[in-house]
Amino acid sequence: PLETSDESLFGSIDQLEVWKDRIYLLDTYKTNAVLVFSTTDGKFIQKIAGTGNGPGEFLTPHSFWIDYHDGSLYVLDRMMSKLLKYNLENLDYEAEIKLPELSPLAFCVPTEGDYLYYFPLRKKDLFGGKQYVKADEKGKVVSTYYDAPASGKILHGNSAPFYVYEGKLRVCPYFSNRVYEWVNDSLKVCWEMK
């Protein structure tokens, strides 16, 4: 069981990742925080909570990503339209990454300096019908991917369509019967439900 104290209470588990000896848990319901617990004994270690809109602060975390390559934790705040980078070990703030456009639904970090975002289709077509956008840390769009079906306008399903399986980045778009793998800067179908 996880430690329960005033500082470690949470209202929901919206995302959960395990890395090394730690559990990273996102609660958007009660605390607007990423909480960190020990995998060995469930003890609460620390948290970063939504406290404001200054440097290193967020209001409503939507999702997070652990970059295993550089030891960083990224937190997406859709309300403030910003992506924040923290040190994975001590949760010290490191940088703010500029988004290519307002309010992506999800993101990941496929390689250092590159950010892959998932955007819903909108009335104003921002990316030529594509839903996945690769951008640099300044928010400059490098390339776009995935011709979205009409159902791409419906915001329902997994809020974190990116995941790593057997060391490979995978993507599962909303309402899709396919799973894609990020290979050589492109999305390739790796599994399809028939």
How should these model regions be labeled?
Residues 1-6, 35-50, 84-98, 131-152, ...:
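Surface-exposed loop/turn elements that mediate protein-protein interactions on large endomembrane-trafficking
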Residues 157-180, 188:
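A conserved active-site cap/scaffold subdomain adjacent to cofactor or substrate pockets
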Residues 3-10, 43-70, 77:
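Blade-loop segments of beta-propeller domains
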Residues 1-32:
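Beta-strand-rich domains and repeat architectures in extracellular enzymes and scaffolds
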Residues 12-15, 59-64, 102-110, 153-161:
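Repeated scaffold domains used in trafficking and secretory/extracellular systems
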Residues 22-25, 72-74, 116-117, 168-170:
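Conserved beta-propeller blade signature
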Residues 18-20, 66-70, 110-113, 164-166:
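Residue-level detector of Asp-centered blade-edge/turn motifs that repeat once per structural unit
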Residues 77-129, 144-151:
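Asp-box/WD-like beta-propeller blade repeats and closely related beta-sheet repeat scaffolds
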